[in-house]
Amino acid sequence: MSTSAIIYSGYNMCKFYDGTKLLSLQDLNGQRPEIYICTTNRTGGKTTFFGKLCVKKFLNNGEKFCLLYRYNYELDGIADKFFKDIGRLFFPKYNMTSERRASGIFHELYIVENGCDNKVSCGYAITLNSADQIKKYSHLFSDVQRIMFDEFQSESCHYCPDEIKKFISVHTSIARGAGEQIRYVPVYMLSN
């Protein structure tokens, strides 16, 4: 994983936050960063922009995504939690479902066109607290192209023990495979 990160507090007068500028920036060495940190006020539109980006990249290019959380209980109702707003706003022809995998260690996300029975896997939802188990299932995540970590800053300072080590472990587990020892898998870290 690249050690560089781009931090940008984006605000514009559009209806929704636009992270296009953030994603176009390079680090001090002129390289494309692997970690993008985006902070704005609550309801600034960060989650909407990056969630829409993940789904749009899947629908247009088949690029799967990963939603990253801290604790397993946060995966309950994940499809509705992630897709309810962006689905209504940007993807009204689609619905999202999820299925627990590996005894609930992670969830596989599926996108379904309304009126169709054919669900298509579009990504995964995993947790930092399951970093050791995720490592054992890393081969399943070799098709992930991007990671979205919403609310990476806890308002109550409730973090996982060794959270940074777990974050690096999860990213490494996802960024290997697909014929590569290490792949470029950007992480969008969003918070207030």
Regions found by a protein language model. Give the residues of each.
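Phosphate/NTP-binding elements of NTP-utilizing enzymes
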Residues: 2-192
